[in-house]
Amino acid sequence: MSRTSSQNQEIINNKHRLKTSKSSKPSKSSKPSKSSKPSKSSKTSKSSRSSGSKSSRSKTGKTSSRKDKYKEEYSQDQYPDEQEYEQEYEQEYEQEYQDNGEQTEEFVENNQDAYPEDIENDERQTQSNKELDTINKKTKERLKNKINKWMDHDDNIKRLNAKMKAFKDAKKQEEESIIKLIDKFEIGESKMDIRDDNKNLRGRVYKHKSVTKGAIKEDIIRDALMEVVRNERKVAELVKKIESKRPINERYYLKRTKGNN
């Protein structure tokens, strides 16, 4: 009897099921061996992988999904304690936040004056300083020439003052001796005509008396007030008041030194 195609197909399917059932039986070799247990080196690789993942996570932008990524990368076998990886995550986030803040502060501090408008202003200021230097060279040269002329006049005055002092000293000595002779001959304040060798009148000389008052000092004011007020406290207040009313005169002048002072 010839077999039909449907029967042949059924036989083939049965054989296939039989083979599949035999292959699905567990064998001795499929049992987990001791070598499959995680070793210390694998733990080290896990820690190195965790440090690498931490450094890569510090460069991510969004912080909202960071915790979820953290849980995905670390399975429960690596971190069986939920609180442990929570603490690890918080420490990492806090350190990254602090580092970013320090970098931002350092950048602002180092670049706060390096903006384009400030650079442009610096360039303009440099250009104006160069122009001022050119003007100042001419002004300084003119000022230098004037100061040299002033120093020439000062030198002449000092030289003439030295000669004049000698003349003044000699004149004073002669004056004292003449007054002694006038007093000796009792000439008094009579005027005397003085002529030169050619009988030309040079001038009229006589003894003259002049009276001047000295400067009003604080002691004089205090003594005068005490004669009237007779109260030391009030006198002190009045003297202080008078002193404050004195006018103050200011003037500017050139002072010359030897150059070392």
UniProtKB/Swiss-Prot annotation:
Region of interest (Disordered), residue spans: 1-139
Species name: Acanthamoeba polyphaga mimivirus (APMV)
Acidic residues composition-biased segments: 79-108
Comp. bias regions, Basic and acidic residues: 65-74, 122-139
Biased composition (Low complexity): 23-55
Family matches, as InterPro entries: DUF5760
Keyword annotations from UniProtKB, A to Z: Coiled coil
Annotated protein name in UniProt: Uncharacterized protein L491
Signal peptide: none
Transmembrane helix is among the record's keywords: no
Pfam families membership: DUF5760
Composition-biased stretches (Polar residues): 1-12
Annotated coiled-coil segments of the chain: 151-181, 218-243
